Design a protein with these regions (language model features):
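Catalytic-core segments of thiol-dependent peptidases
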Residues: 1-59, 67, 143, 175, ...
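Active-site-proximal C-terminal subdomain of hydrolase catalytic domains
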Residues: 54-205
Length: 205
């Protein structure tokens, strides 16, 4: 498959307690890496998956940049290891649809990502990917509105629960991959993209 799209529960079946899939059975990162067959340069999209873009429905407040980066990194790792070009996660409505529309229009991964950032969404992280430093990881979300609250609803084995938590910084749109990859390269042999960092918020090729 050139496109793998998952919309379901988050999982703790990867290393560091994040990663994997929840289908009929729980699927580990190792199973994805050893059993899933993707075409070279495939795109992997996660829609509204707890932890997939950073934030999870079970969070109590701001998880912090490091935890958000670790979650996204661990979800993405097995797919990128087996040849995917890009991992993209979006917790907003039709965010994945808009991303794909832009990709099919010929935009690069980074352009698709930038276009998917809604009003009020801020860029939190943009740096080398910890497991493959030749790739980029970017994470965005909203900042906290002090004095306000959000109602979190969860459904576990048919039991629905709601709780009110203070609003905090969220991590809701993320990607890992080559920012310059576009649909014109999807059938080409994978090429190497290298980032040389000057400082934390800028880079050159």
């Amino acid at each position: 498959a050139h496109f793998f799209i998952y919309s379901g529960h988050g999982s703790n079946m990867g290393k560091n307690g994040t990663g994997g899939l929840v289908l009929k059975d729980w699927i580990t990162n190792d199973q994805i890496q050893n059993e899933l067959k993707l075409k070279d340069n495939a795109l992997v999209l996660f829609k509204s998956v707890c932890g997939g873009a950073g934030s999870s429905a079970g969070d109590n407040g701001d998880i912090g940049y490091k935890e958000a980066e670790l979650r996204v990194s661990d979800y993405a790792e097995p797919f990128l290891t087996i040849g995917a070009s890009t991992y993209y996660a979006n917790n907003y409505g039709d965010g994945c649809v808009s991303f794909l529309e832009d990709f099919f229009d010929g935009l690069s991964i980074e352009e698709c990502y930038d276009n998917s950032l809604l009003w009020g969404v801020n860029k939190h992280i943009s740096k080398n990917y910890m497991y493959q430093p030749n790739l980029k990881i970017a994470i965005s979300g909203s900042n906290a509105n002090s004095g306000t609250h959000t109602v979190i609803s969860t459904d576990s084995n048919g039991v629905k629960k709601s709780r009110k938590v203070p609003n905090s910084k969220s991590y809701s749109i993320s990607y890992v991959g080559n920012p310059y990859f576009d649909i014109g390269e999807i059938y080409k042999k994978k090429r190497t993209y290298v980032m040389n960092w000057i400082k934390s918020d800028s880079y050159k090729i």
